[in-house]
Regions:
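Residues forming the flavin
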Residues: 1-16, 20-336
């Protein structure tokens, strides 16, 4: 469904994620946000943990409670309603023109039709750097052992997390949205495309750990044009759909095959969690441009030096990961 999926709907893409509540900014409103989420049903521990997280299972109820609270306060939520003809003073929703004092667009990183409309209407939209890659899955017990050693499995520690990065020249390879005890989920929002993302439940008690392993893409890689940025993502997603068999299975390649330039090795020890293992062997070098493959290979080898076993040859890599951030930037005025 192109209008209701993991990218669009109640809570947006964040509903199906690890539910991390972290930010790099230091703002007094952070505690206000945490307190509000707590009042709406988030667990008590988000108020005191250094790295709080909610988890998709609980977050779905939190979003439901938020909807009810917005309605109670006089707000109106219209689902399955497309916003068009957007100006600074009005918007058309399902054919109804709604005048307003201000329009706030919070459309996330995947509203490609909205981006295209804004560009066509003359709004200032520019191409920006983003990232593409794959989802790497390891046994959570292997990550725990590599990170905690003899203390792996201690309930007071919880499952181990990681965040890895490596640079070569002006390009980087890094892990993103690491989900301890989580699963890889299908996140396409257009027909004929395959996209991966990761999510965890609050308990983080799944067998696998997963994280996106992504390579930075610069505007000059795709023509420094906002529409070209969207098309770069879309082409990768279409190639993934074809490589997966055109039935929304995801393409998968083992880490060992990716490093050595081979393909066809089936998964064994680690079962990919994407739709319960609905993956097919593929050759990612036929999906990604050479600069992405070069950085993925080098980055994964480097990560194996930081976490023992990270670059194990039987690690399944599922793709494609294209929605880590928006490929375009809508320019704000000086008053914002």
């Amino acid at each position: 469904d192109t209008s209701t999926n993991i990218q669009f709907g109640a809570g947006g893409a964040g509903t199906f994620s690890d539910g991390k509540l972290t930010t790099r900014i230091n703002d007094p409103l952070i505690m206000y946000v945490l307190d509000m989420l707590h009042q709406l049903g988030a667990p008590d521990d988000i108020m005191y943990k250094a790295k709080p997280h909610i988890g998709t299972d609980i977050l779905r109820k939190v979003v439901e409670n938020a909807d009810k609270e917005i309605t109670r306060l006089g707000g109106e939520i219209r689902y399955k309603s497309k916003a068009e003809n957007i100006t600074s003073s009005s918007v058309t929703v399902n054919g109804e023109r709604i005048p307003c004092g201000a329009v706030i667009l919070a459309c996330g990183h995947s509203a490609r039709d909205t981006y295209s409309e804004l560009i066509g209407a003359g709004f200032s939209v520019e191409a920006k750097p983003f990232s593409v890659g794959v989802r790497a899955e390891h046994l959570q017990s292997d990550i725990d052992t590599a990170m905690y050693g003899a203390h792996a499995g201690d309930s007071q520690l919880g499952h181990a997390e990681y965040q890895l990065s490596w640079r070569q020249g002006d390009r980087g390879c890094y892990t993103f949205c690491m989900c301890p005890g989580g699963e890889v989920v299908p996140s396409a929002s257009e027909e004929g495309g395959v996209v991966t993302n990761g999510m965890s439940r609050h308990a983080r008690d799944g067998k696998n750990a997963n994280a996106a392993v992504c390579v930075s893409v610069k505007p000059e890689d795709y023509g420094n044009n906002p529409l070209s940025a969207i098309e770069f993502q879309r082409n990768l997603e279409k190639r993934a759909f074809l490589a997966g068999g055109e039935d929304y299975y995801a393409p998968m390649q083992t880490l060992g095959d990716l490093i050595s330039g081979k393909s066809g090795t089936e998964y064994k020890r680690i079962v990919p969690s994407y739709r319960g293992g609905k993956v097919r062997c593929a050759d990612f070098s036929k999906l990604f441009p050479p600069f992405v493959m070069e950085m993925l290979r080098a980055g994964l080898v480097n990560f194996g030096k930081k976490i023992k076993g990270y670059d194990a040859p039987d690690v399944p890599l599922t793709g494609v990961e294209t929605r880590t951030s928006s490929p375009v930037r809508i320019i704000r005025g000086e008053n914002l």
